[in-house]
């Protein structure tokens, strides 16, 4: 097992060498105000059998989870996804995966056991969607994609404690810390045969910063790498420069200074470059998502003169909600201008306009929209509003007459072309398989806007109330029994009316005797 812990400080935050103490077998950190990423890599023989039995059928498996809480993503860990659980999967062989001894599909069975037994996951063929491939050169795009809004990782913590920790109390504590993480990534590919799990905390759980002792593992065979880093101004627009201190616990006697730069796909914007999402009431069955972008976020990112940039939004819509791809893909300039949209770049998943939610087997749909932005000559003093017309599917009836629908916030970013020849190689902080970055070319750079929810709400998920059929008795004329009886009565009356009309037609068009012509007159005429 290999462990890497990285603390990332803002340049404005104070740091003193006395806050860290490195000994022969541990590193002590005291009151460190920083973001924290922990990454653990397991080899195949360190995994439980039920886990590697599923992984050996996977060519790629990438799991992403983000909290519903708003958090700050610092450079170089600035990439974002919509809140919830995202699964990206490619099988080793095309076709159906081998089922277990009880006839269950192995991947969905494992996902339910690890994350939540209520996941709407039956099999990749039935529950996953197939993402579009707009850039064939971007090899990271997987064959299947799954999503579900998952507020907590409590089941994952329990699974790790039972399958990996045993009676190790420190391991139990480290696993429990996942509950306060802002994002968690799990990666596996058939080339490396290694499972990597990483967690990101934008800040320490307490107000005093990080205070902890990181020791080397018993036996001394596992490697523990520590980094205390901070981003610095880079000389090139496509690069990120990082400097700080590094150490390997149990090998190094002191922290070693370091400074390095690398091309990066993901870059943060100024902290004032924010956006918020609302659904103006009343939402009804045709809600409109409004993305309000701060004026600071409308300025194009720093780029080379020959580069082009465009503002985008990537929507993750559960099956209850969908867009009309025919409406959003229009080239009508009046419609696009009225909503501040430029074009629909990509769509994948359920887009049936008439299907009710209970007939949908796949989880939902993804939408990549290019957004219109004001020209440089236009001065925008207030927020720039993007409106996206959406639609709700028919949902099962309820006693209250309403059903809840949770909608995660979209990811909003600038996508800019990099200089020809720029190699976006894998760097220590690179993050791919996010769903949306695979829809662009391999040398595209992304500049992330920061979600900024209202102080009253605080979450990156919007809650809608969907009007449905009322099951409750004595609730007026719109309860289920009245509608069922009324429907039966109308159909019966209509059927009887049709029979009555057919009877009248039959009576009025009875067979009449034909008059025989006089053959004599015919002969006389001849």
UniProtKB/Swiss-Prot annotation:
InterPro entries: Pbn1, PIG-X/PBN1. GO terms for biological process: GPI anchor biosynthetic process. It is found in: Endoplasmic reticulum membrane. Glycans are attached at residue 385. Keywords: Endoplasmic reticulum, Glycoprotein, GPI-anchor biosynthesis, Membrane, Transmembrane, Transmembrane helix. Residues 1-484 are lumenal. Pathway: Glycolipid biosynthesis; glycosylphosphatidylinositol-anchor biosynthesis. It holds the Pfam family PIG-X. Residues 506-526 are cytoplasmic. One of its GO terms (cellular component) is glycosylphosphatidylinositol-mannosyltransferase I complex. SMART domains: PIG-X. The chain crosses the membrane at residues 485-505. It is a single-pass type III membrane protein. Required for proper folding and/or the stability of a subset of proteins in the endoplasmic reticulum. Component of glycosylphosphatidylinositol-mannosyltransferase 1 which transfers the first of the 4 mannoses in the GPI-anchor precursors during GPI-anchor biosynthesis. Probably acts by stabilizing the mannosyltransferase gpi14. Belongs to the PIGX family. This is Protein pbn1. It comes from Emericella nidulans (strain FGSC A4 / ATCC 38163 / CBS 112.46 / NRRL 194 / M139). The gene is pbn1.
